């Protein structure tokens, strides 16, 4: 026991990661069959002990760094496309979509075992509604994600200030020809697809039944981001991540970037909530199981 306490003191995980993207978080019950499978217990709303755990702060740092890298690569890609005078000389919308999807794939893979690999306040919100993490951790994650996004966009502006300010800074706005309602709807549906994919790819019951599911989880999540970007870049530039939208808007800081900004918070949070309800209530029927 003394050795175990020493590990905790030195920074080893005292509190188990509840984020479902983390492979260790949902490993319990791997030997159970479908009939005997037991749902993981819901995370407490508030867990004061987390604030004394190094793993809590380590997870927040991982979210900060991941979101920083995400904004850095993706906004640089957007600037590269904007700089080109010919569609044939650039990667185009497909390349932008690949940069977003590819970075999510890589970063979820890298951070899944540390923080759960959220990299998105909408994902964190959806998982919180499903009681996969505490309110304390959810708020901390969202703050760190937003700070990372601001820093990532800021570094891009520092590298290419003229190009950055002259080409919209990667900020999300509703494109001409579309209404705010169109933009809101695109963000709701796009985020629903992403968060539903997160729930499905990291489902605890599937993880218990099929050992390969946790390892492959980053792939469908990244691919969902790629496909949503292909569909909605012409409408809103594709938000589906409030931290990504906030970071670009703060660093770009022009009126038209702020006039539509509410869409990129309200839409993703509604989409995440709908995905959480759909998966937990309809697909998994967890509220009904708890009564039986």
Curated annotation (Swiss-Prot):
Q: Where in the cell is it found?
A: Cell membrane
Q: What is its main location?
A: membrane
Alphabetic keyword roster: Cell membrane, Membrane, Repeat, Transmembrane, Transmembrane helix, Transport
- Transmembrane stretches in the record are 61-81, 96-118, 139-159, 181-201, 215-235, 263-283
Q: Which segments carry the region annotation Disordered?
A: 1-42
Q: Single GO cellular component annotation?
A: cytosol
For whether the record's keyword set contains Membrane, the answer is yes
Q: GO molecular function terms here?
A: water channel activity
Q: Where is this motif: NPA 2?
A: 241-243
Give the way it sits in the membrane.
Multi-pass membrane protein
Q: Where's the motif NPA 1?
A: 120-122
Q: Name one Pfam family in it.
A: MIP
Q: A GO BP term, please?
A: response to water deprivation
| Top-level taxon in the UniProt lineage | Eukaryota
Domain-level remarks? Aquaporins contain two tandem repeats each containing three membrane-spanning domains and a pore-forming loop with the signature motif Asn-Pro-Ala (NPA).
The family note in this entry says: Belongs to the MIP/aquaporin (TC 1.A.8) family. PIP (TC 1.A.8.11) subfamily.
Described by its record, this protein's role is as follows: Aquaporins facilitate the transport of water and small neutral solutes across cell membranes.
The identity of this protein, by name, is: Aquaporin PIP1-3/PIP1-4
Q: State the organism named in the record.
A: Zea mays (Maize)
